[in-house]
Regions:
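A glycine-rich phosphate-binding loop feature that marks nucleotide/adenosyl-phosphate handling sites
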Residues: 277-281
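Single conserved hydrophobic/aromatic residue that forms the stacking wall/gate
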Residues: 1-15
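Short, flexible loop/turn segments with low-complexity composition
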Residues: 272-276
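Acidic catalytic motifs of isoprenoid enzymes
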Residues: 16-206, 213, 217-240, 244-253, ...
């Protein structure tokens, strides 16, 4: 289901939860207590900028695909390519009371386009798995824009389509090889992160690949109780999360360390502190919360 909600004074578009339980979005975000106020305000500006790019190009159907994950990509591309920044203060339907800082670069438009492609292929995957009315409507709603974007970004679109199809086939085979499953999502994000085919493309691919693997593993671990209850696919089915905790933590550390090593090779000119906060702290927000909950259960 897609919905918009207010969290305190901030707008949060709740990530669409796939019928099979794996939205695989929402993990790549800041850890607010460890971020300087000026950096937090900057991050919010980029988040709002992406939201406005989605709305201006695609309307509400674009705006509801907004994720924190793509905000990281906008920051990364804007920093490495030293993109021109357009900063404004605007009102919006979510924040009608006052104007909000909105920071936009060319990378926001790219991320908005990729968000639409990802949304379309997630609906296609849902339709394959569940044959639900919601998925069918989603495919119809996003198909037209997707066709145009496939022409504009053939490499990225092909990687997303092939990655989702490989993932679907492995799930149909009841594959329990987490690394093989995560590889599918990693390959998708690798091509998404490589905006341009230049001398930096391989470093972007490496960052996206390992971050994608981290996201898949984290998502499977978080969704295990719900997937078990609803008898949905999950590579960790049949194992208690408390027993899995050390193994999953080691897997996640391996992937995020590799993502961080690739990220540090990129010549980031600005926003480095924000991105390091995300990569080395924020991505662990949900895992740390689950870990605390499991520890409380044992007491």
């Amino acid at each position: 289901e897609i919905c918009a909600c207010l969290v305190g004074s901030e707008m949060c578009i709740r990530d669409r939860k796939r019928e099979d339980g794996s939205s695989m979005f929402g993990y790549v975000r800041i850890r607010k207590p460890e971020l300087l106020v000026k950096d937090y305000e900057c991050y919010k500006g980029f988040y709002c900028g992406l939201c406005h790019s989605l709305r201006d190009t695609y309307g509400l159907r674009g705006q509801v695909t907004l994720t924190y994950d793509m905000t990281f990509l906008v920051l990364l591309l804007s920093s490495v390519y030293d993109l021109a920044v357009k900063e404004e203060h605007k009102r919006c339907i979510i924040h009608p009371a006052g104007k909000r800082r909105v920071i936009r670069t060319e990378a926001a438009d790219y991320a908005a386009d990729i968000n639409m492609l990802l949304s379309y292929y997630h609906f296609v995957d849902d339709k394959q798995d569940e044959h639900s009315l919601a998925a069918s409507l989603g495919v119809q709603m996003y198909r037209g824009q997707s066709r145009r974007l496939e022409q504009h970004y053939p490499r990225q679109a092909r990687a997303i389509a092939e990655g989702m199809q490989r993932l679907h086939l492995l799930e149909q085979e009841d594959c329990r090889n987490v690394s093989a499953l995560a590889d599918c999502f990693g390959r998708m994000l690798a091509e998404v992160f490589a905006w341009k085919e230049d001398g930096l493309a391989d470093f972007f691919r490496e960052t996206g690949y390992y971050l994608g693997k981290f996201i898949y593993i984290m998502d499977a671990f978080e969704d295990l109780p719900e997937d078990t209850h609803k008898e949905r696919f999950n590579p960790y089915l049949g194992t208690d999360r408390r027993e899995l905790l050390p193994q999953v933590e080691e897997q996640l550390l391996t992937e995020i360390a590799a993502a961080g090593a690739a990220f540090e090779k990129l010549p980031c000119l600005e926003y480095r502190d924000i991105m390091r906060n995300i990569l080395y702290a924020g991505v662990w927000n949900r895992f740390d919360r689950i870990k605390q909950e499991l520890q409380k259960e044992e007491q």
